[in-house]
Regions:
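A feature for the membrane-embedded catalytic helix bundles of lipid/isoprenoid biosynthetic enzymes
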Residues: 4-5, 18-77, 154-305
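Basic amphipathic alpha-helical segments that dock to polyanions
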Residues: 8-17
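Membrane-embedded alpha-helical segments that form the functional core of polytopic membrane enzymes
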Residues: 90-146
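Short amphipathic alpha-helical coupling elements at transmembrane boundaries
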Residues: 77-84, 134, 138-141, 148, ...
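Hydrophobic residues within alpha-helical transmembrane segments
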Residues: 99, 121, 125, 150-153, ...
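Conserved small-residue-rich
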Residues: 57-110
Length: 305
């Protein structure tokens, strides 16, 4: 029957190995309509949906790191609304973020406790706006490839400027050279992004980068693992089986930009630049090894598949 067309289509996609994922509805409505009465009832329910709120919730990522999720995304939606009402473009927000990062670098270069505190506050606000520009682009549907590229370039530039300013400020106040640590942190970050970019080029999503399973007959039981063949049994696989704590731990161990921002904003004012760089190098080294191992394992799996 026509009412089951969606279910049959989804079944065919999944059993053909096409990657699909569930999208949370949030405050939106999505129901199967089988008759006129159900359609009229659903139309009445749709009238009460706050479309702006739904678009705002959809614009905020749910797969960010711990710091970004709780210290930024928990309240950045208010800034997105204000920016949209002020008719700011995502690129304009990116520019303001860069300006705040420049102010943070000036304060960091002072090397004093007050300078480090003020710099940390400005750098945090810069990161907040760095998240807001992408959220605004998704909320207003005005995102562009140029804006995404510009945002990425500015992210790296802001971090490198902060590292350089911290090193300069520490040398001015303490008379000690921590530039080797700062340069090491920059090189490690550049290496991590090179690894990620090389992997993305080797397995682009539009040319087989997304993991595809083998085609399978529609007559096979739904819980039979296609990788095990007809004699195999289903086995828990994928993110659906991972404990939430493990997911959060994996997001933190790779030291994403949110956690790097947290290290700069929290460690620098308390322990100053030297300890900040040591934390970034130690944590970044672990993250690089973890990421490299993961890329190798995934590459081997895809080569076998």
């Amino acid at each position: 029957p026509a009412a089951q067309a969606g279910e049959l289509l989804l079944t065919g996609l999944v059993r053909s190995g096409v990657p699909v994922r569930a999208v949370p509805l949030g405050p939106l409505h999505a129901r199967r309509i089988a008759d006129r009465a159900a359609a009229e009832a659903e139309l009445a329910g749709l009238a009460g949906v706050d479309e702006e709120r739904a678009r705002l919730e959809a614009a905020i990522k749910t797969d960010d790191g711990v710091f970004t999720r709780y210290a930024v995304s928990s309240w950045s939606g208010h800034l997105v609304r204000l920016a949209a009402r002020a008719k700011l473009t995502p690129n304009a927000v990116t520019g303001i973020s860069v300006g705040l990062a420049a102010i943070a670098a000036v304060w960091f270069s002072a090397g004093t406790r007050i300078g480090l505190l003020a710099g940390a506050a400005a750098f945090y606000l810069s990161f907040v706006l760095d998240c807001v520009d992408g959220q605004l682009a998704r909320f207003t549907r005005r995102g562009t490839a140029l804006g995404s590229w510009l945002d990425t370039i500015c992210d790296r530039g802001k971090e490198f400027a902060a590292y350089a300013a911290l090193a300069a400020g520490y040398g001015a106040v303490h008379g000690q050279d921590v530039w080797p640590l700062a340069i090491g942190a920059m090189l490690l970050l550049a290496l991590r992004h090179a690894i990620g970019s090389a992997y993305a080029d080797a397995f682009p999503p539009d040319r087989g980068g997304a993991r595809r399973g083998p085609a399978r007959s529609l007559t096979l039981p739904y819980d039979l693992d296609p990788y095990d063949g007809e004699a195999g049994g289903g086995r828990p696989r994928g993110r659906a089986r991972r404990a939430p704590r493990l997911v959060w731990a994996r997001r933190m161990v790779v030291l994403p930009i949110g956690e790097r921002t947290a290290v700069i904003c929290l460690v620098a004012p308390v322990f100053e630049a030297r300890v900040t760089f040591l934390v970034l190098l130690a944590w970044g080294g672990v993250a690089t090894l973890y990421m490299l191992a993961g890329r190798i394992v995934r590459s081997l799996r895809r080569a076998e598949g």
